[in-house]
Amino acid sequence: MIALIQRALSASVVVEGNIVGEIGPGLLVLLGVEQGDTEQKAQRLCERVLGYRIFSDENDKMNLNVQQAGGSVLVVSQFTLVADTQKGMRPSFSRGAIPQEADRLYQYFVAQCRERGVKTETGLFAADMKVSLVNDGPVTFWLQV
């Protein structure tokens, strides 16, 4: 399971002209689910995402996690993160989980974020989404479990 996290001043997701998820300061989390991923992996990745200290403290040092910074999380499913790009000029998505399992683990990840008390917004699984982001920094990290 892969999370590409971006520190955001704001982020939103639009589906068919309607905003389905929107946050102010916090994290945009692009989430990719691979074959063999489990609830345990989703839980561990959630802990890492929410615990990752990439927000500045009073000394302007990256020392606070999203909760400590008072931020929110916008989680967007993105199967392209699991693409194999090692060969050729076309990505292979054979490592991706089947859609039903990917959706289940995506929803589980979101539930884990909410259970930990973080305001969590979402995109719409498998939809054609327009994602907007005002990246703060930019600060972007790739987390994988």
Curated annotation (Swiss-Prot):
Keywords, ordered alphabetically: Cytoplasm, Hydrolase, RNA-binding, tRNA-binding
Domain of life: Bacteria
Localization per record: Cytoplasm
SUPFAM superfamilies in UniProt: DTD-like
Signal peptide annotation: none
A GO CC term attached to the entry: cytoplasm
Motif mapping: Gly-cisPro motif, important for rejection of L-amino acids: 137-138
Membrane-spanning segments: none
EC number, as in UniProt: 3.1.1.96
Single GO molecular function: D-tyrosyl-tRNA(Tyr) deacylase activity
GO BP term, pick one: D-amino acid catabolic process
Reactions it catalyzes: glycyl-tRNA(Ala) + H2O = tRNA(Ala) + glycine + H(+); a D-aminoacyl-tRNA + H2O = a tRNA + a D-alpha-amino acid + H(+)
InterPro entries per record: Daa-tRNA_deacyls_DTD, DTD-like_sf
Pfam families cross-referenced by the UniProt entry: Tyr_Deacylase (PF02580)
Complexes and interactors: Homodimer.
HAMAP family linked to this entry: Deacylase_Dtd
General function of this protein: An aminoacyl-tRNA editing enzyme that deacylates mischarged D-aminoacyl-tRNAs. Also deacylates mischarged glycyl-tRNA(Ala), protecting cells against glycine mischarging by AlaRS. Acts via tRNA-based rather than protein-based catalysis; rejects L-amino acids rather than detecting D-amino acids in the active site. By recycling D-aminoacyl-tRNA to D-amino acids and free tRNA molecules, this enzyme counteracts the toxicity associated with the formation of D-aminoacyl-tRNA entities in vivo and helps enforce protein L-homochirality.
Domain notes: A Gly-cisPro motif from one monomer fits into the active site of the other monomer to allow specific chiral rejection of L-amino acids.
Family: Belongs to the DTD family.
Protein name: D-aminoacyl-tRNA deacylase
UniProt organism field: Yersinia pestis
UniProt lineage: Bacteria, Pseudomonadati, Pseudomonadota, Gammaproteobacteria, Enterobacterales
